[in-house]
A protein has these predicted regions:
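Active-site bordering "gate/hinge" segments
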Residues: 1, 5-219
């Protein structure tokens, strides 16, 4: 939990209080079987449920010497990327909302729903999917999955330009964001910032490229 003292856009003081959302997951896992521990991973971060469960599955599979079929590896990779899009769209939409750009906020949530619908149709869950299992996945993809993913990709490409026109390319948004919350490349590396945060600071550390897993080395 972060308690902030602000002066306009400048954070003057920041007090960190740890423990408010600590749930002792590592301790809980000591008394669970390997399959039982998987239920906890989806709840670590509802915007990264697929990736968290995937990571633990890979750890267990490596320890047990389980070979995962290539089709499963492709399914896991695609699901991870859909979840990543879900996460980025929520970030974009909430940033817009915090800055009062409600039109852009609604656009972001509109398109995030399309991703969640695709995930739900195959996994049965929108946020917590419990889809990956040790050595595989709970069930094969829905018959409409491939078609809907392709349709979403074709839909989303021009929409990104629309986002830029209404928000990221807007002079008001740019003036408010420039110089606010600056994170240097050195601090990004020191703090372990990755993804979009790291790239914005000049630190392009992408584990999918540096240490490919699943089928990231092939796509």
């Amino acid at each position: 939990m972060l308690f902030r003292s602000l002066e306009g856009e400048i954070i003057k003081k920041l007090d960190v209080h740890c423990g408010y959302i600590h749930r002792g997951i590592e301790k809980m896992c000591e008394e669970l079987t390997y399959p039982q521990t998987l239920a906890l991973t989806d709840r670590l971060d509802y915007l990264g449920a697929s990736q968290n469960r995937h990571a633990l599955c890979m750890c267990i599979e490596k320890g047990l010497g389980v070979e995962v079929p290539e089709r499963v590896q492709y399914i896991r990779t695609i699901m991870d990327e859909l979840q990543r899009i879900d996460s980025h769209l929520l970030f974009f939409a909430c940033l817009c909302m915090d800055m009062g750009a409600l039109t852009a906020f609604f656009y972001g949530f509109r398109d995030r729903e399309k991703v969640l619908d695709i995930l739900e149709q195959t996994t049965g869950g929108r946020l917590i999917q419990t889809y990956n299992t040790i050595g595989g996945v709970q069930a094969d993809i829905h018959p409409d999955f491939v078609r809907k993913v392709k349709e979403f990709i074709a839909y989303m490409r021009p929409v990104l330009r629309e986002y830029h026109e209404i928000f990221t390319g807007n002079v008001i948004a740019q003036e408010r964001l420039k110089g606010t919350g600056v994170l240097t490349r050195e601090d990004a590396i020191s703090f372990g910032a990755t993804g979009g945060t790291g790239r914005a600071a000049g630190w392009a550390c992408d584990v999918r490229k540096r240490h490919p897993y699943a089928v990231y080395g092939k796509v």
